[in-house]
């Protein structure tokens, strides 16, 4: 198999994996109000796809998943969002861990 074909095949597999992660994220978002355990399972599947294909989880998905207990985070339901000292602090209500993301202040 030529090298170019192998690279194209790898890119195709990565694109399919990202599409599946996006779809599972949408399903987790829709399923959370009725069945939070199913949304947690969808998050586990997202992580499995990411690890199996050795690609990173997209940023918009990664910011909605707890880095400690891997719960699907919904503001006001099981997560608390606060702005403190130039950071967005997301607190998971299930495990109590905090994640901090810097944000740029307007001058």
Swiss-Prot record:
Zn(2+) binds at residues 66, 69, 92, 95. It is an enzyme of class 3 (hydrolase). Its main location: cytoplasm. It is found in: Cytoplasm. Keywords: Cytoplasm, Endonuclease, Hydrolase, Metal-binding, Nuclease, tRNA processing, Zinc. GO terms for cellular component: cytoplasm; ribonuclease P complex. It comes from the Archaea. The keyword Cell membrane does not apply. Its EC number is 3.1.26.5. Transmembrane segments: none annotated. Belongs to the eukaryotic/archaeal RNase P protein component 4 family. PANTHER family: RIBONUCLEASE P PROTEIN SUBUNIT P21, RIBONUCLEASE P SUBUNIT P21. Part of ribonuclease P, a protein complex that generates mature tRNA molecules by cleaving their 5'-ends. This is Ribonuclease P protein component 4. It comes from Methanosarcina acetivorans (strain ATCC 35395 / DSM 2834 / JCM 12185 / C2A).
């Amino acid at each position: 198999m030529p090298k170019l074909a192998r690279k194209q095949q790898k890119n195709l597999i990565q694109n399919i994996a990202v599409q599946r992660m996006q779809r599972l994220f949408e399903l987790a978002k829709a399923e959370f109000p009725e069945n939070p355990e199913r949304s947690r399972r969808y998050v586990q599947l997202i992580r499995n796809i990411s690890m199996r294909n050795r690609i990173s989880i997209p940023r918009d998905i990664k910011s909605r998943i707890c880095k400690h207990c891997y719960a699907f985070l919904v503001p006001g339901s099981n997560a608390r969002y606060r702005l403190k000292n130039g950071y967005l602090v997301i607190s998971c209500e299930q495990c109590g861990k905090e994640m901090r993301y810097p944000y740029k202040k307007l001058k």
